From Swiss-Prot:
<dbReference type="GO" id="GO:0031172">
    <property type="term" value="F:ornithine N5-monooxygenase activity"/>
</dbReference>
<keyword id="KW-0997">Cell inner membrane</keyword>
<dbReference type="InterPro" id="IPR025700">
    <property type="entry name" value="Lys/Orn_oxygenase"/>
</dbReference>
<feature type="binding site">
    <location>
        <position position="284"/>
    </location>
    <ligand>
        <name>substrate</name>
    </ligand>
</feature>
<dbReference type="GO" id="GO:0006879">
    <property type="term" value="P:intracellular iron ion homeostasis"/>
</dbReference>
<keyword id="KW-1003">Cell membrane</keyword>
<feature type="binding site">
    <location>
        <begin position="45"/>
        <end position="53"/>
    </location>
    <ligand>
        <name>FAD</name>
    </ligand>
</feature>
<protein>
    <recommendedName>
        <fullName>L-ornithine N(5)-monooxygenase</fullName>
        <ecNumber>1.14.13.195</ecNumber>
    </recommendedName>
</protein>
<dbReference type="Pfam" id="PF13434">
    <property type="entry name" value="Lys_Orn_oxgnase"/>
</dbReference>
<feature type="binding site">
    <location>
        <position position="69"/>
    </location>
    <ligand>
        <name>substrate</name>
    </ligand>
</feature>
<feature type="binding site">
    <location>
        <begin position="254"/>
        <end position="257"/>
    </location>
    <ligand>
        <name>substrate</name>
    </ligand>
</feature>
<dbReference type="GO" id="GO:0005737">
    <property type="term" value="C:cytoplasm"/>
</dbReference>
<keyword id="KW-0521">NADP</keyword>
<keyword id="KW-0285">Flavoprotein</keyword>
<feature type="binding site">
    <location>
        <position position="240"/>
    </location>
    <ligand>
        <name>NADP(+)</name>
    </ligand>
</feature>
<feature type="binding site">
    <location>
        <begin position="284"/>
        <end position="286"/>
    </location>
    <ligand>
        <name>NADP(+)</name>
    </ligand>
</feature>
<comment type="subunit">
    <text>Homotetramer.</text>
</comment>
Length: 443
């Protein structure tokens, strides 16, 4: 049995994950501390160092929203943590202006996020995976939480906190038909694209036939990278839709990502929320930037001109079966138009199938009796029953109640400000949690 080490500090807030959402929160808390006093805050992240979608940062990838929607500018344009100041500090501001774009490459935005995160080294711990979160009871009430994590050395650490913010991001969505192939290095999710592609024979120039499952931005980016970076690869795009569909990023539609739209969504009844989410679904899901669609179409057009059919575009196609064989991954493909079933064998399969956001429920399972249906308030605080005195916040898990921007970068600064305000209002100079922790250490 692993020996757990308990720390003596009682934290005011522990954050699970230190991605963009919690970095934005760290900034907001730092600003608020100047007027209201600093809190004892710690963020835990399972990655060994800071990386934002590090395994998907191919050279062609560009940010899909304006750089002005960084970690802070929407609420405090003069912040030293703005993207503009990052460019200034790295002596690239004039060069970036000369690019004439609102959309930096994701590699640069990742470096920006890493740069901001480096200012909060004392408040962050990398290489620590949060295993579980347990209630600490006093007289039948939850006065604090016990956060158990495991570091890279396998050591378990136990910390106490008066409040919690859960923001671990999404987990790869693996279609049912591929789940039996878990662990097979020839089948991998797009979130692990670079790591797995480096291990494939095509990285040394050997021929490969690769399937890309999905019809969204990730699938399109994977296809272009395979076409441009791996001349020995034959890539098949396999998607259920009849075509690659463009993202609607027109100005009026883009207002769905404005902070004020969160109030509109949250104030509506459940049925109306669902209707609005469906109406604007094509702003973010299963859609592709228009310029990328045009590039892909150009690839297939040039194939027709040359008469050399290197790649295939298989729309209206469903994967009914996936089988691992010595020769490769065998896919049974159903053409929705003709009903015909065909079998193709691939050397590798890339699952560009999106993400699920249920990890917060798994982490908070020991608190289930206090959380009810996991309803989230306007301030992103989970609605607990009266026995739970701890404030628990969730970032990136409330699209159904707060709108499509909840999982995106669009509202990070404003959301961080709202959570920090709610947190300071909740935390009062009481000693119940600290006394409870001292009792736990002594027992």
């Amino acid at each position: 049995m692993t020996q757990a080490t308990a720390t003596a500090v009682v934290h005011d807030l522990i954050g699970v994950g230190f991605g963009p959402s919690n970095i934005a929160l760290a900034i907001a808390l730092q600003e608020r501390a100047q007027a209201q006093g600093a809190l004892e805050v710690l963020f835990l992240d399972k990655q060994g160092d800071y990386r934002w979608h590090g395994n998907t940062l191919v050279s062609q990838s560009e940010l899909q929203i304006s750089f002005l929607k960084d970690l802070v500018s929407l609420r405090n344009p003069t912040s030293p943590y703005s993207f503009v100041n990052y460019l200034h500090k790295h002596d690239r501001l004039v060069d970036f202006i000369n690019l004439g774009t609102f959309y930096p490459c994701r590699m640069e935005f990742n470096d920006y996020l890493r740069w901001v995160a480096s200012h909060f080294q004392e408040q962050s711990r990398y290489g620590e995976e949060v295993l579980r979160i347990e209630p600490m009871l006093s007289a039948g009430q939850v006065e604090a939480l016990r956060v158990i994590s495991r570091n890279a050395d396998g050591e378990e650490l136990v910390r106490t906190t008066r409040a919690l913010v859960v923001s671990p991001g999404g987990t790869p969505r693996i279609p049912q038909v591929f789940r039996a192939l878990k662990g097979d290095g020839r089948v991998f999710h797009h979130s692990q694209y670079l790591e797995h592609m480096a291990k494939q024979p095509c990285s040394s120039g050997k021929p490969m036939k690769i399937a890309i499952i999905g019809g969204g931005q990730s699938a399109a980016e994977a296809f272009i990278d395979l076409n441009d970076s791996y001349p020995s690869v034959q890539a098949d795009m396999i998607l259920r839709a009849s075509a690659l569909k463009p993202a609607d990023d027109s100005p009026f539609v883009n207002e769905v990502f404005a902070p004020k739209f969160t109030d509109l969504i949250y104030s509506r009844e459940h049925a109306e929320r669902e209707r609005l989410l469906r109406e604007y679904h094509n702003t973010n899901y299963s859609v592709v930037d228009t310029d990328l669609i045009e590039r892909i179409y150009g690839v297939f057009y040039r194939q027709k001109v040359s008469g050399i059919p290197r790649h295939a575009f298989r729309c209206m196609t469903t994967v009914e079966r996936a089988t691992a064989t010595a020769q490769g991954i065998e896919l049974a493909l159903r053409d929705a138009g003709s009903g015909e079933l065909s079998v193709e064998t691939y050397d590798a399969v890339i699952l560009a199938t999106g993400y699920e956001r249920q990890l917060h429920r798994q982490l908070l399972e020991p608190l289930a009796e206090y959380l009810g249906d996991h309803e989230i308030g306007r301030d992103y605080r989970l609605q607990t029953d009266e026995r739970c005195k701890v404030a628990i916040y969730a970032q990136g898990f409330s699209q159904a109640s707060h709108g499509l921007s909840d999982t995106l970068l669009s509202v990070l600064p404003v959301r961080a400000e709202e959570i920090s305000g709610s947190l300071y209002q909740h935390l009062k100079p009481g000693t119940a949690a600290r006394a409870l922790h001292e009792h736990a250490l002594a027992s």
